[in-house]
């Protein structure tokens, strides 16, 4: 699938720059097939859009906030400030742009904002909003020289949690994949742009998870155990979390860690807002219920796992609970090492 004039379609064409706000970039050359499990994850999560949930990342909340979006907007503004998107004309790449909320905020600042995404549903939604978004993986950019040196900054807001799979860990490729991701961010940034940065948000764990546990059927693991919860998360969410400190090592020689903020509490609050909205939708929105029924008919195992993980065992919210939560959400700002060779 490729983007043609903003829509996900079946033949490659050059994306048309419809205004001065857009960048004349071709559809990236397909190199890596998007993970089927990650694509399915977002196909199923698209059902939540019926309940008005279009923002799946963390937030930063104040006591007076009343909605999910209050904290998410504050978090997005923080990320844009960190990457340097403060002046009109800033060229921004958003890797894993979701439903485009960050792109809209960047455009409101006068930026020329571009997104890449592996979810056809989200790409089409963004395109309908007039956003410049391409259906591809971030790794496709490595083999697309027209994209190299085109941006003043890059953001990956939660997407890197999908980039490594348990099979990659078993094969000893985890650090290689993370290092390559920093090389790609380095390559697409304009070497002549001043003071450039790459900003990421990602869940981390204190100790590496056993990939065999994640690949094992979750229902074979003890109920309530950390092993079962993380296995549930993988079978629905499809990914593998980096260990604290791992990305800093993998960023070399391309980037140096400049700033790190713990956003775990904000993710917990955002997840509680989403849970309340979804539960309310189950009782008040027949379209949401029907969407879940259709998902069960099309993808019974993965949808049932999603329901078990999210509503019954609440593994998603579990990872943020307690005095020492099982995961830590880090917002990290990386400064480009201009002398590094990519």
Label the predicted regions.
Residues 10-82:
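Conserved Class I S-adenosyl-L-methionine-dependent methyltransferase catalytic core
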Residues 142-154:
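A short acidic, Gly/Pro-enriched loop at the edge of an enzyme's catalytic core
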Residues 193-203:
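Conserved beta-strand signature within the Rossmann-like core of class I S-adenosyl-L-methionine
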Residues 99-110:
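Conserved SAM-binding loop of SAM-dependent methyltransferases across substrates and taxa
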Residues 130-141:
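Conserved SAM-binding strand-loop segment of SAM-dependent methyltransferases
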């Amino acid at each position: 699938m490729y983007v043609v004039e903003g829509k996900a379609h079946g033949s490659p064409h050059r994306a048309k720059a419809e205004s001065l706000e857009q960048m004349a970039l071709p559809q990236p050359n397909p190199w890596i097939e998007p993970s089927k499990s990650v694509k399915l994850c977002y196909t199923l999560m698209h059902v939540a859009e019926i309940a008005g949930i279009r923002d799946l990342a963390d937030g930063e909340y104040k006591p007076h906030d009343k909605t999910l979006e209050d904290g998410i907007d504050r978090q997005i503004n923080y990320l844009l400030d960190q990457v340097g998107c403060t002046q009109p004309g800033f060229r921004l790449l958003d890797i894993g742009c979701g439903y485009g909320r960050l792109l809209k905020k960047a455009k409101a600042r006068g930026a020329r904002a571009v997104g890449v995404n592996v979810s056809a549903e989200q790409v089409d939604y963004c395109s309908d909003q007039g956003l410049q978004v391409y259906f591809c993986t971030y790794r496709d950019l490595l083999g697309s020289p027209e994209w190299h040196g085109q941006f003043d900054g890059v953001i990956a807001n939660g997407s890197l949690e999908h980039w490594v799979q348990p099979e990659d860990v078993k094969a000893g490729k985890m650090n290689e994949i993370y290092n390559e991701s920093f090389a790609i961010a380095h390559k697409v940034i304009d070497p002549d742009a001043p003071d450039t940065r790459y900003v990421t948000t990602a869940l981390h764990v204190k100790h590496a998870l056993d990939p065999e546990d994640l690949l094992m059927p979750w229902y074979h693991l003890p109920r309530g155990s950390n092993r079962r919860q993380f296995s549930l998360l993988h079978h629905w969410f499809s990914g593998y979390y980096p260990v604290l400190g791992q990305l800093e090592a993998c960023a070399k020689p391309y980037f140096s860690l400049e700033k790190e903020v713990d956003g775990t509490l904000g993710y917990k609050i955002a997840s509680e807002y989403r849970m309340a909205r979804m539960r309310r939708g189950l009782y008040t929105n027949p379209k949401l219920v029907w969407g879940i029924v259709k998902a069960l008919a099309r993808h019974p195992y993965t949808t049932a796992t999603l329901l078990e993980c999210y509503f019954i065992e609440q593994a998603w919210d579990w990872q943020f609970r307690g005095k020492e939560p099982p995961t830590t959400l880090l917002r990290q700002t990386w400064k480009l090492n201009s002398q590094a060779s990519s």
